[in-house]
């Protein structure tokens, strides 16, 4: 890697999960648009053919980046300046169990990748992989900056740091961005203020997918009262800022978000599908009819399987030149973060990092999501303060479970992970006997990934 004026050339990016048909394509697009950076992206994936296809797609863009698929993680990592991780831990068969087995016991999960029974078992598959990633990063590129996109985000980042304490890693999630966009729309509709999400200053604090905003300003204007008026206007009907909520599993009318604002007076800053899973006792996920009433969706794994098949077809067409790869800004910030870390301009954005005091009221080393300051070769968390006690209480079981699930996965302690399972708000509605039955069934479904337990 070398600097040439205001450009950086010869950058090496290692991509673990380089066969991705989502995050990898977004990265390709953003890199092609950023003229100040150039280099090589090494694509590693357990599905080598998927990585090879992405190599062809990336090189067809004829950008300032070269893409190389490799069949060993070591080759990808050796001497890397940046490491990007976006993987599916296990297969959709396991995710089918994560999401749908609990439905036999009346537990409905809208995503199933972060919290709840599904999030827990996904974590048990993920943590051993991240121990391996951290150890190989330590060996082959200890000074690289590591960007994680995989869920469960908090436990992925925690595993990287617990395994390799000197790692330079952070986790990125776009959920807060959509809430900032919503605040900008509220400012326009209520006060006639034209602004983008980047123009708004927000204080972000919480844990991934259960993040909150307690301060939002545009110039000297406090936007919390503006958002309050917006919520009052749209609470009953909802506000469909991304189109008809019925048209996509990923759309909602923000009614969960609005309800939480009415209950707690601060802005819940994630999508309704994610927020609802942390607080199932509010009834948002009581049954499919309740979900429809709150105007969001349960996302069936069958849809993910069908969508994957469509993306595979799309990737083959793009590799053959039969379909055009659209180069457009993805809305993600990974490339902006790289630029800042390379010294090409500072950046403030929200990321997931171990708590070193940036968030009060949460145990040290818990992975929290707050704003951070990015500058050359440094990410400095920004003091975010403390959530109201009433909101912090909602976080508590999830913060404790983050610690217990990690410890159980490292020790392969089935009894401890069952206690974490019992502590999850979803599971508390069950009798002990039913909780044990559900746990054992899900454990058996995941046994291929739980050898030695």
From Swiss-Prot:
Amino-acid positions noted as binding Mn(2+) in the UniProt annotation, renumbered to this chain: 173, 209
Pfam families, per the entry: Glyco_hydro_4, Glyco_hydro_4C
Residues that hold NAD(+) according to the record: 11-72
Active site: 174 (proton donor)
An example Gene Ontology molecular-function term: metal ion binding
An example Gene Ontology biological process: carbohydrate metabolic process
Top EC class, one word: hydrolase
Reactions mediated catalytically: [(1->4)-alpha-D-galacturonosyl](n) + H2O = alpha-D-galacturonate + [(1->4)-alpha-D-galacturonosyl](n-1)
Name by which UniProt lists this protein: Alpha-galacturonidase
């Amino acid at each position: 890697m070398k600097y040439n004026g205001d450009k950086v050339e010869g950058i090496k990016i290692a991509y673990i999960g380089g066969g991705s048909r989502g995050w990898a394509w977004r990265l390709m697009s953003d890199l092609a648009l950023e003229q100040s950076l150039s280099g090589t992206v090494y694509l590693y994936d357990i599905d080598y053919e998927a990585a090879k296809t992405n190599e062809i797609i990336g090189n067809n863009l004829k950008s300032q980046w070269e893409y190389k698929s490799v069949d060993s993680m070591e080759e990808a990592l050796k001497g890397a300046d940046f490491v990007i991780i976006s993987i599916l831990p296990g297969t959709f068969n396991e995710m089918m169990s994560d999401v749908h087995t609990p439905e036999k016991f009346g537990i409905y999960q809208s995503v199933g990748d972060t919290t709840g029974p599904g999030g827990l078992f996904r974590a048990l598959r993920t943590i051993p992989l991240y121990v391996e990633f951290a150890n190989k990063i330590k060996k082959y590129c200890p000074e690289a900056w590591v960007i994680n996109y995989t869920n469960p985000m908090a436990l992925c980042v925690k595993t990287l740091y617990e395994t390799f304490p000197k790692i330079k890693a952070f986790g990125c999630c776009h959920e807060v961005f959509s809430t900032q966009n919503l605040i900008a729309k509220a400012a326009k509709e209520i006060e006639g203020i034209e602004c983008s999400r980047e123009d708004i200053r927000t204080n972000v604090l919480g844990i991934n997918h259960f993040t909150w905003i307690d301060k939002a300003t545009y110039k000297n204007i406090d936007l919390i009262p503006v958002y309050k008026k917006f919520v009052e206007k749209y609470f009953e009907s909802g506000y469909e800022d991304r189109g008809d909520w019925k048209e996509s599993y990923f759309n909602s009318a923000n009614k969960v978000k609005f309800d939480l604002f009415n209950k707690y007076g601060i802005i819940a800053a994630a999508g309704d599908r994610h927020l609802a899973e942390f607080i199932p006792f509010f009834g948002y996920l009581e049954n499919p009819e309740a979900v429809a009433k709150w105007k969001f969706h349960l996302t069936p794994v069958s849809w993910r399987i069908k969508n994957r098949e469509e993306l595979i077809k799309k990737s083959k067409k793009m590799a053959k030149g039969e379909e055009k790869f659209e180069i457009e800004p993805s809305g993600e910030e990974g490339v902006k973060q790289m630029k800042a870390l390379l010294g090409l301009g500072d950046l403030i954005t929200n990321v997931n990092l171990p708590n070193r005091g940036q968030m009060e009221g949460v145990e040290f080393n818990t992975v929290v999501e707050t704003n951070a300051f990015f500058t050359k070769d440094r990410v400095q968390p920004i003091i975010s303060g403390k959530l109201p006690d009433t909101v912090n209480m909602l976080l508590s079981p999830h913060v404790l479970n983050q610690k217990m699930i990690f410890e159980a996965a490292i020790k392969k302690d089935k009894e401890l992970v069952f206690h974490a399972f019992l502590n999850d708000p979803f599971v508390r509605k069950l009798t002990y006997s039913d909780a044990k039955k559900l746990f054992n069934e899900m454990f058996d479904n995941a046994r291929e990934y739980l050898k030695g337990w």
